[in-house]
Amino acid sequence: MTSTTKTDSAIDYENPWLCEGSTFTSDDIGDFFGFVYRITNLQTSKQYIGRKYFWAFRTPKGKKRKQKQESDWKKYYGSCPELKEDLKLYGKLQFKREIISLHTTKGQCNYEETRQLFINNVLTEATNDGTPAYYNSN
């Protein structure tokens, strides 16, 4: 009998992304181009919604054609300066990284990120004390 449960030895990066409650690894990428994600600060509950592509297309020195390679998605924590400051302050393990949805095209990924930003009211949502609920709000 074989098990499909991932063991700690199969997880090759710190604070792994979770997708539907399970750790997401390179083996899970398949035909997906990218994903929409939520990062939650476990100390303050402040969140960030964004998107990331699994693949980077770069032209190596001396070459004419772009080559496809896996991006830095495992280490990625968003592009927001305020979020980056809090990562330094609290440490990466104080943040939960969740994949909201997976997409097979760049266009689907971009569309779903925008849709999530609107349905979650990231520009206007605030906590009871008036603090923005999302890092995206600034």
Which residues does each predicted region cover?
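Structure-specific nucleic-acid interaction/processing domains
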Residues: T2-N138
